[in-house]
């Protein structure tokens, strides 16, 4: 007789009938893949039941190893073993060499300034290395799910910029994966905890992984996840703990490993093992390169306490941006393997005044959240229960006359978002316009970050102010920016997708925000001055054109008075007092009132010449 399958209410009895989707946590140190099976999110293990896949790739002449085997080969063949490639994603070669001068790899520049790494398999770039890691994760998912994936959600640090996000998408495509969405890592963790606990209120997500730190302040209310503010440091993580401890071990053992990458790898492995031991024990035994010794938890904590304090400074800035205090935070979610370090949990608990949440494995929580989101996006589950809102970290705008910045999308605006503003031409007969896209909080172009420039050509040759150009800024769910400019009367259009050639660190973002606050008053004054100077230039240029056409309408005395008022305005423009410039503009306007009226009369007479009253 036929067997009847029975499942729990709300769970699927036949998961193979669902569309196959996966969430991927593409980490700096380790990566994971997860999926939703029978209604529950779970990470997928390899044949040895290991959930984590080290984000390490070893390149040989005829073979590529990914994961644990590659990690084991790192000490023997460091030049051909690429690890922590996530730190290189979207960065220029010059930037990488400056940030990480001790990397053992043989770099070669490419035509676009991006890094290429010489290996036994040939030249590879960070996108290709990331693709090899994604291929291994995808293969694990296919084997576990017994089928091809319909789509994946891949997580990225909250402060990954456009180039880094695009590089991640390119790596996924190279791995043969369909990307449903890129998802911020802290937001993925919020999804995992929010769905499990139904918590409402303000939540802090403290994500300290191998190579990046992110802090996100979120508000969860009735299934809505809203990111109030983000912060962090894209060059700070557990890897830095490991390197500090490895340096300490080298000094204690009296080992000079600076030119021996194999010994350096052994020191690093010993440091990692000691760090893991010290999460549960007060003392760890260490044996490396013929040296044996011990390190206490107290000694380890003294090495890393300054780095932990740096993360708390970022937490303080994020709370200020969100407009909330630590007392208003209901729960603190801990994400990332480095949050297992007792000092981290202790310091974070003291800062927020409550014991952090660790009920979901901090190594797995991001992948689990990504899997839940992938399951929704692939169509297995209605998304009416949950709305996900991310934010952009810095304001986006464009340059206007006088070197001013007109903000189109303010900082911390929820994405995806589209905003448009209308602009016009400054000169008579202007047939082209340069659109200069900027990022930052300051009032002047020179103080903001330039993202891109493009030209809108073919404008109708109208008088100044006659053409109307609509500029639309659109940020998609992955944080990628598209800018489109269109002249309304002709439909002439130009657009660009912003992909910076290198990343912007969290420290730089924090400094840009801090500078905008520190210079707020002086920036407002500089903006007022520039605005009056632009208006003065417009008035003078317009008046000079009018005088060239109709100077005969003025008496000699009137011409002299106008010339003197123009000279006075030009003199004030050289100064720094916007009020004086404004007064000079008004004085010139008063001198030209009669002239303007006569020009209007003359224009009407010319228009009526040769026409009868009936025709009018």
Swiss-Prot record:
Disulfide bonds: none
Signal sequence bounds: none
Cited InterPro entries: ATPase_NBD, Heat_shock_70_CS, HscA_NBD, HSP70_C_sf, HSP70_peptide-bd_sf, Hsp_70_fam, ISC_FeS_clus_asmbl_HscA
Top-level taxon of origin: Bacteria
GO molecular function terms attached to this record: ATP binding; ATP hydrolysis activity; ATP-dependent protein folding chaperone; unfolded protein binding
BP-aspect Gene Ontology terms: iron-sulfur cluster assembly
Gene3D superfamilies xref list: 1.20.1270.10, 3.30.420.40, Actin, Chain A, domain 4, Substrate Binding Domain Of DNAk, Chain A, domain 1
Keywords annotated in UniProt: ATP-binding, Chaperone, Nucleotide-binding
Keyword Chaperone (UniProt): yes
NCBIfam families for the chain: HscA, PRK05183.1
Similarity comment: family membership: Belongs to the heat shock protein 70 family.
PANTHER family membership: HEAT SHOCK PROTEIN 70KDA
Function as written in the Swiss-Prot or TrEMBL entry: Chaperone involved in the maturation of iron-sulfur cluster-containing proteins. Has a low intrinsic ATPase activity which is markedly stimulated by HscB. Involved in the maturation of IscU.
Stated name of the protein: Chaperone protein HscA
């Amino acid at each position: 007789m036929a067997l009847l399958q029975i499942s729990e209410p709300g769970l699927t009895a036949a998961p193979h009938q669902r569309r196959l989707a996966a969430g991927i946590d593409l980490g700096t140190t380790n990566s994971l893949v997860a999926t939703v099976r029978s209604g529950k999110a779970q990470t997928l293990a390899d044949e040895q039941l290991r959930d984590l896949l080290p984000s390490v790739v070893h390149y040989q002449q005829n073979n590529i190893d990914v994961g644990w085997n590659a990690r084991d080969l790192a000490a023997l063949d460091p030049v051909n073993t690429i690890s922590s490639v996530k730190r290189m994603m979207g960065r220029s070669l010059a930037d990488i060499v400056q940030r990480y001068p001790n990397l053992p790899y043989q770099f070669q520049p490419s035509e676009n300034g991006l890094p290429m790494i010489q290996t036994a398999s040939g030249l590879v770039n960070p996108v290709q290395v990331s693709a090899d890691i994604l291929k291994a994760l995808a293969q694990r998912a296919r084997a576990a799910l017994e089928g091809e994936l319909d789509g994946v959600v891949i997580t990225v640090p909250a402060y990954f910029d456009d180039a880094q996000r695009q590089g991640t998408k390119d790596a996924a495509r190279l791995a043969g994966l369909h990307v449903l969405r890129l998802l911020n890592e802290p937001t993925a963790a919020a999804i995992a905890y929010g769905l499990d606990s139904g918590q409402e209120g303000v939540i802090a997500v403290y994500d300290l992984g191998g190579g990046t730190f992110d802090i996100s302040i979120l508000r969860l209310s009735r299934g809505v996840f809203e990111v109030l503010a983000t912060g962090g440091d894209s060059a700070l993580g557990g890897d830095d703990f490991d390197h500090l401890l490895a340096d300490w071990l080298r000094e204690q053992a009296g080992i000079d490993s600076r030119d021996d990458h194999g010994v350096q790898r052994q020191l690093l492995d010993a440091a990692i093992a000691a760090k893991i031991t010290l999460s549960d024990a007060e003392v760890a035994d260490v044996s490396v390169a013929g040296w044996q010794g011990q390190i206490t938890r107290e000694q380890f904590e003294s090495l890393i306490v300054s780095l932990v304090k740096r993360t708390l400074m970022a937490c303080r800035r994020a709370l200020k941006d969100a407009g909330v205090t630590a007392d208003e935070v209901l729960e603190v979610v801990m994400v990332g393997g480095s949050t297992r370090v007792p000092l981290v949990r202790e310091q974070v608990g003291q800062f927020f005044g409550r014991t952090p949440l660790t009920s979901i494995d901090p190594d797995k929580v991001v992948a689990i959240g990504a899997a839940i989101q992938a399951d929704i996006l692939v169509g297995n589950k209605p998304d009416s229960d949950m709305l996900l809102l991310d934010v952009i970290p810095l304001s986006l705008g464009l340059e206007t006359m006088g070197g001013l910045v007109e903000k189109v999308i303010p900082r911390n605006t929820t994405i995806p978002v589209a905003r448009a503003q209308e602009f016009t031409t400054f000169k008579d007969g202007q047939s082209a316009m340069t659109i200069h896209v900027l990022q930052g909080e300051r009032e002047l172009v020179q103080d903001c970050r330039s993202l891109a420039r493009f030209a809108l050509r073919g404008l109708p040759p109208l008088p100044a102010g006659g053409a109307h150009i609509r500029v639309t800024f659109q940020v998609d769910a992955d944080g990628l920016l598209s800018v489109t400019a269109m002249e309304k009367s002709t439909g002439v259009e130009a657009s660009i997708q912003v992909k910076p050639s290198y990343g912007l660190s969290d420290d730089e973002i924090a400094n840009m925000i801090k500078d905008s606050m520190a210079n707020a008053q002086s920036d407002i004054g500089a903006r007022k001055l520039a605005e009056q100077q632009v208006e003065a230039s417009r008035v003078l240029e317009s008046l000079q054109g009018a005088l060239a056409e109709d100077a005969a309408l003025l008496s000699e005395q009137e011409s002299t008075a106008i010339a003197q008022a123009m000279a006075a305005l030009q003199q004030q423009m050289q100064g720094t007092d916007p009020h004086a410039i404004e007064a000079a503009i008004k004085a010139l306007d008063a001198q030209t009132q009669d002239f303007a009226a006569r020009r209007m009369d003359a224009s009407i007479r010319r228009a009526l010449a040769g026409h009868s009253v009936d025709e009018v």
